[in-house]
Every structure is written in C-alpha cells, then in structure tokens.
Curated annotation (Swiss-Prot):
Mg(2+) binds at residues 44, 46. This is Riboflavin kinase. Its cofactor is Zn(2+); Mg(2+). InterPro entries: Riboflavin_kinase, Riboflavin_kinase_bac/euk, Riboflavin_kinase_dom_sf. Catalyzes the phosphorylation of riboflavin (vitamin B2) to form flavin mononucleotide (FMN) coenzyme. Transmembrane segments: none annotated. The gene is fmn1. One of its GO terms (molecular function) is metal ion binding.
Length: 198
C-alpha cells in the first residue's frame, strides 16, 4: 500500500543522472492492457519489455525520462518529449506479466495539464494512436516503487503526482538539456543523437 504523507517534488541528484541511468530502451509501440485510456484516462505507449533483460537489477516502479517517436508516422521532424513510465506488474490490477507503460507528456514549455485538480478532473496529455511506431526511451531517474491502492481514484491521483514530479525533475539544468539540446555535454549530445535515430 502507498505510505501516507507528502511526496518529494523532485527525485534524482541535481547534478544529473547517476548510474544506472540513463537507461536506453526502444521498441515498437504495442497494444497494452487497454486500461490506460479507458479506465484511467491516462493514455500510455507500451513497448515490449525485452530490453529490460540488459538491466537485471532494475527494480519495478515508476520512472521519468525522455522519449522520441519515429517521425515518419507524424511529421518530418523528431521531437524529444518528457515522459513518466511504469515498469512492473501494476499490483492494483494484479498483472502477471511485466510491462513497460509510458505516458508521454507535453513539452515542459506548455502549461502542465496535471498541476491542479482532483482525481477524475485532470486532463492527461493525449496523442493519436501510434501502434507499430518505433519509440526510443531514455530513462533518467526513479520516482517510486509500485504500490497497491484502495481505489482507482487513489491510483489516478498518484499518477497525477508522478507526472508533476517528472516535470519538476526534468526542469533542472542537468536534465532539461536532454530535451532542449542546449548547454549539454558531449555525452548528452550522443544520447540525444541515439534518441532521434530511427
């Protein structure tokens, strides 16, 4: 069960990702359990969990990072966007297979759709269906472990907070360079190049 008490507004060191981060995962967007949009109102892009075998010590839980989608399905330009994701079994739904469920958020320069509002009244970011589109994901930090919840509303509220923690964490200088490409190190430039290579 989720512990009581307030959540930290940011996670990860201010100096930037530390091992094992950043973690690279990629794959085609596949159909998930069909609950993200229908039951939760939180659309997700699921990718096969095969790449997790390269990270056997990675714990289940909620993470944040940046994603890029193959532009051939959308526009001529690849955009890197912030993301919050779940890796695990989702105890609330008693899943028996591990999944990688990614919620792609709007650019940090846009107003946050999850900053305010009670569960059930928040408008999470929505994108058109893109099943089969290749997605590259760079995981930059860990937010929290998986929890079971007493209600669907409690789950949605925690996901809303996850989105805000991800946004606040990514707005720090050492992280925002992954999105903007400005004032970034050679290592970050290489990782951005990988993100946008399809």
């Amino acid at each position: 069960m989720r512990p009581d008490g307030p959540r930290d507004p940011v996670t990860g060191p201010d100096s930037g990702p530390e091992p094992p981060f950043p973690i690279k995962l990629s794959g085609p967007v596949i159909k998930g359990f069909g609950r993200g949009s229908k039951e939760l109102g939180i659309p997700t892009a699921n990718i096969p969990p095969d790449g997790l075998s390269d990270y056997p010590d990675l714990q289940v839980g909620v993470y944040y990072g940046v994603v890029a989608l193959d532009p051939s399905r959308f526009t001529s330009e690849t955009t890197i966007l912030p993301a919050v994701l779940s890796i695990g079994y989702n105890p609330f739904y008693k899943n028996t297979t591990r999944s990688v469920e990614i919620h792609i958020m709007p650019p940090l320069s846009s107003p946050s759709p999850t900053a305010n509002g009670e569960a059930g009244q928040v408008k999470f970011n929505k994108l058109p269906d893109f099943y089969g589109t290749k997605l590259n994901l760079l995981i930059l930090g860990y937010i929290r472990p998986e929890y079971d919840y007493v209600s669907l509303e409690a789950l949605v509220e925690d996901i809303r907070i996850d989105c805000e923690v991800a946004r606040q964490s990514l707005q720090r200088k050492a992280y925002v360079s992954y999105l903007s490409g400005q004032d970034c190190s050679e290592a970050v430039q290489e990782q951005r190049k990988w993100l946008t290579s399809f």
